[in-house]
Amino acid sequence: MANRLILVDGSSYLFRAYHALPALTNSKGLNTGAAKGVIGMIRKLVADYAGDQVVVIFDAKGPTFRNDIYPEYKANRPPMPDELREQIEPIHDTIRAMGLPLICIAGVEADDVIGTLSVQAAGGGREVVISTGDKDMAQLVNEHVTLINTMNNTTMDHGGVVDKFGVPPELI
C-alpha cells in the first residue's frame, strides 16, 4: 500500500541508538555511535516502506509549552549527555542529505508534532505508520494509524493496543 505517511520519532530513535549501541568515534575523536544507529534505522525504514512518504520529527532544543503550563515538567530528568548532544546536528544534516523532510519546531515536542500530523492525515483518509518506541503513541492508533517498533519489527493496530494495554487506544 503505497503513499502512506510514515512518521519517524527521531528523538525516540536518538535515545534508543545512544543507549543500545557502543560508543563510537571517528578519526577526529567525535562521537558517532548514536548517529550511526539513527541513520541505520532510518535507512532500513525507508527501504521497508519504499514508495511511501517518510518524515522524521525531532524535539527542538529548549523548553516547550508544557514547561509554561507546569514548570516542573520533566524537571527530574537528567540533562542530555554532551556525547549525545554533539551528534544531533550531524544527524539532522544527514537526514536532510538523504532527501527526507525533517521537522523540529521550537517550543513543541516531537510527540505533539507526530500526533498533529497523524490526526490530520488520518482524518483525510490517509494511512499513517508511526515509528517509535514511545508507548504513549498508542493513543493515536485507529483504523488509519498503526505503530511500528523497529527494534522487534512488530506493528500494533487497534487490536494490538487492546491486547497490550487492556484498553482501546482512545482510553489511553
Pin down the residues of each PLM region.
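Domain-level signal for Mg2+-assisted phosphodiester chemistry and nucleotide/NA-binding surfaces
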Residues: 1-101, 152
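Extended two-metal-dependent nuclease catalytic cores across DNA- and RNA-processing enzymes
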Residues: 2, 24-25, 75-172
